[in-house]
């Protein structure tokens, strides 16, 4: 199997994540701190004296923060504001804050959920709560194959297993190995890994990158080895790191799956270090005590 361009895939995810972070700022949403503070205090607002700009701001706040007196739909009916204003900010906020009621209202009012290259479904695929919104977006035209199945890749990178299940229910033919390659190897979680393995993802993708980057994380290592991860991708340096983890459980499972830790005996030791160790041993210090001293794991010193 050809290698996936993991670097490019991860870069695309990182760029979108940065966009999401910016989206969550008041600078992007054009909500003033003063207005938000007042709204969160459940203050009474004279809505009959608001400029159009302030009407829009109030409607945004009604999505971001619930208010007993001002619902988005009621405000929309009163103000007659263009629901696609500010680059469809109402749609984006409804998705970001999992407001299913507002999203349905926007769709019924003619808002296109595919705007900005299907930004809405891309965003929702990374949000853990209320994944019914994904169904709502898809059933109203959202394209889950956009940008080389980006919603799948983003859901995987955000550890959103429930979103992945929904996405696969619509298109089960996506190569799960592509999703595995799109995650930063050092950030993958066991639940997502197990789910992708259940879809026959190749755990040795990109020369065993996932095992190499997670060689001390037991849940991931256990899943990888059980799924057939090739331990030959582990270098001597990896074995040294595993030993230095002082985790007997993880060493035991590696041994169970055929890892030969004796390979570290081939490490080239500098002459001055060898002389130092030999001197200590010649003076009667046992090698096992030296090992504990050098690893800072000798818990008790006895006189």
From Swiss-Prot:
Lineage: Viruses, Varidnaviria, Bamfordvirae, Nucleocytoviricota, Megaviricetes
Domain of life: Viruses
Keywords noted in UniProt: ANK repeat, Repeat
ANK repeats: 86-115, 117-146, 147-176, 200-233
Name this protein carries in UniProt: Putative ankyrin repeat protein R601
Gene3D superfamilies xref list: Ankyrin repeat-containing domain
């Amino acid at each position: 199997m050809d290698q996936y361009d993991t670097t490019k895939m991860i870069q695309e995810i990182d760029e979108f994540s940065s966009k999401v972070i910016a989206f969550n700022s008041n600078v992007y949403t054009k909500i003033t701190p003063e207005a938000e503070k007042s709204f969160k205090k459940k203050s009474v607002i004279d809505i009959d004296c608001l400029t159009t700009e302030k009407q829009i701001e109030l409607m945004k706040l009604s999505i971001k923060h619930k208010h007993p007196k001002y619902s988005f739909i009621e405000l929309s009916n009163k103000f007659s504001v263009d629901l696609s204003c500010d680059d469809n900010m109402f749609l984006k906020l409804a998705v970001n804050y999992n407001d299913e009621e507002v999203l349905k209202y926007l769709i019924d009012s003619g808002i296109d959920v595919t705007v900005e290259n299907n930004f809405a479904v891309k965003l929702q695929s990374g949000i853990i709560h209320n994944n019914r919104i994904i169904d709502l977006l898809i059933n109203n035209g959202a394209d889950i194959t956009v940008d080389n199945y980006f919603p799948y890749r983003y859901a995987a990178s955000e550890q959103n297993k429930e979103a992945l299940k929904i996405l696969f229910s619509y298109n089960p033919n996506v190569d799960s190995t592509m999703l595995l390659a799109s995650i930063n190897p050092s950030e993958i979680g066991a639940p997502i890994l197990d789910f992708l393995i259940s879809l026959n993802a190749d755990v040795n993708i990109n020369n065993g990158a996932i095992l190499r980057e997670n060689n001390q994380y037991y849940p991931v290592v256990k899943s990888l080895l059980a799924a057939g991860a090739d331990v030959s991708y582990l270098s001597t340096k990896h074995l040294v790191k595993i030993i230095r983890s002082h985790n007997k459980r993880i060493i035991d499972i590696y041994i169970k799956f055929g890892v030969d830790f004796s390979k570290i005996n081939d490490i080239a030791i500098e002459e001055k270090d060898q002389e130092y160790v030999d001197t200590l041993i010649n003076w009667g210090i046992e090698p096992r005590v030296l090992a504990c001293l050098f690893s800072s794991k000798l818990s008790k010193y006895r006189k």
